[in-house]
């Protein structure tokens, strides 16, 4: 390289500080108020929120609250043909280790407090999938005196899967919709 070539790393004597480095002036936008800009625009918060929601969607742990015949279709979704684990969703036996509860089947008045107790044991953020006509609105037994007309009267439901019974494909689609919902929602409150 010749002495006349452009050297972006070389500073003139006028711009060099006492330490030999560049001293920013008061009008330098990078150094003045960087934390103010981050607080205002939330760059770091948005990036962390995207990272957290990506991690949550790729590691959903689900548990079953299988009450009737819809639970059989739920078992099909976990088998090799549909394989929910390839989407990052694995079954768990304890509510304390799960993020998603699948309510599948007819919910009776006697079973409703147990459903609420299991839901309360789940850590935040927690999600509920209502699977089948019976869990969605009472289904075939809607007019029975002992049936809760939808599990959304007991716990907040995020995804409804219709059908009697819904297929395993419908459950996989419901899980994918739940992943989209988690990505859309933020997890960090500002």
From Swiss-Prot:
<dbReference type="GO" id="GO:0005886">
    <property type="term" value="C:plasma membrane"/>
</dbReference>
<keyword id="KW-0830">Ubiquinone</keyword>
<dbReference type="GO" id="GO:0008137">
    <property type="term" value="F:NADH dehydrogenase (ubiquinone) activity"/>
</dbReference>
<keyword id="KW-0997">Cell inner membrane</keyword>
<dbReference type="GO" id="GO:0045271">
    <property type="term" value="C:respiratory chain complex I"/>
</dbReference>
<keyword id="KW-1003">Cell membrane</keyword>
<dbReference type="GO" id="GO:0015990">
    <property type="term" value="P:electron transport coupled proton transport"/>
</dbReference>
<keyword id="KW-0479">Metal-binding</keyword>
<dbReference type="GO" id="GO:0005506">
    <property type="term" value="F:iron ion binding"/>
</dbReference>
<feature type="binding site">
    <location>
        <position position="69"/>
    </location>
    <ligand>
        <name>[4Fe-4S] cluster</name>
    </ligand>
</feature>
<dbReference type="GO" id="GO:0009060">
    <property type="term" value="P:aerobic respiration"/>
</dbReference>
<keyword id="KW-1278">Translocase</keyword>
<dbReference type="InterPro" id="IPR006137">
    <property type="entry name" value="NADH_UbQ_OxRdtase-like_20kDa"/>
</dbReference>
<comment type="function">
    <text>NDH-1 shuttles electrons from NADH, via FMN and iron-sulfur (Fe-S) centers, to quinones in the respiratory chain. Couples the redox reaction to proton translocation (for every two electrons transferred, four hydrogen ions are translocated across the cytoplasmic membrane), and thus conserves the redox energy in a proton gradient.</text>
</comment>
<feature type="binding site">
    <location>
        <position position="70"/>
    </location>
    <ligand>
        <name>[4Fe-4S] cluster</name>
    </ligand>
</feature>
<keyword id="KW-0004">4Fe-4S</keyword>
<feature type="binding site">
    <location>
        <position position="164"/>
    </location>
    <ligand>
        <name>[4Fe-4S] cluster</name>
    </ligand>
</feature>
<keyword id="KW-0520">NAD</keyword>
<keyword id="KW-0874">Quinone</keyword>
<keyword id="KW-0411">Iron-sulfur</keyword>
<dbReference type="InterPro" id="IPR006138">
    <property type="entry name" value="NADH_UQ_OxRdtase_20Kd_su"/>
</dbReference>
<feature type="binding site">
    <location>
        <position position="134"/>
    </location>
    <ligand>
        <name>[4Fe-4S] cluster</name>
    </ligand>
</feature>
<dbReference type="GO" id="GO:0050136">
    <property type="term" value="F:NADH:ubiquinone reductase (non-electrogenic) activity"/>
</dbReference>
<keyword id="KW-0813">Transport</keyword>
<keyword id="KW-0408">Iron</keyword>
<dbReference type="GO" id="GO:0048038">
    <property type="term" value="F:quinone binding"/>
</dbReference>
<protein>
    <recommendedName>
        <fullName>NADH-quinone oxidoreductase subunit B</fullName>
        <ecNumber>7.1.1.-</ecNumber>
    </recommendedName>
</protein>
<keyword id="KW-0472">Membrane</keyword>
<comment type="subunit">
    <text>NDH-1 is composed of 14 different subunits. Subunits NuoB, C, D, E, F, and G constitute the peripheral sector of the complex.</text>
</comment>
<comment type="similarity">
    <text>Belongs to the complex I 20 kDa subunit family.</text>
</comment>
<dbReference type="Pfam" id="PF01058">
    <property type="entry name" value="Oxidored_q6"/>
</dbReference>
<dbReference type="GO" id="GO:0051539">
    <property type="term" value="F:4 iron, 4 sulfur cluster binding"/>
</dbReference>
């Amino acid at each position: 390289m010749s002495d006349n070539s452009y050297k972006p790393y070389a500073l003139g004597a006028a711009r060099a500080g006492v330490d030999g480095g560049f001293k920013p002036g008061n009008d330098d936008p990078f150094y003045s108020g960087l934390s103010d800009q981050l607080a205002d625009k939330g760059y770091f918060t948005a990036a962390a929120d995207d990272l957290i929601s990506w991690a949550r969607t790729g590691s959903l742990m689900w548990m079953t609250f299988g009450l009737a015949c819809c639970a059989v279709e739920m078992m099909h979704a976990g088998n090799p043909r549909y394989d929910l684990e390839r989407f990052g969703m694995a079954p768990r036996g304890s509510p304390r280790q799960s993020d998603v509860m699948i309510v599948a089947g007819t919910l009776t008045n006697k079973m409703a407090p147990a459903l609420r107790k299991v839901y309360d044991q789940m850590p935040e953020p927690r999600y509920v999938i209502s699977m089948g006509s019976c869990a969605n609105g009472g289904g075939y037994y809607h007019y029975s005196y002992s049936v809760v007309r939808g599990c959304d009267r007991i716990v907040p439901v995020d995804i409804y899967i219709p059908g009697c019974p819904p297929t395993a494909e419908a459950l996989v689609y419901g899980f994918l919709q739940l992943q989209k919902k988690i990505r859309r929602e933020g997890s960090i409150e500002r």
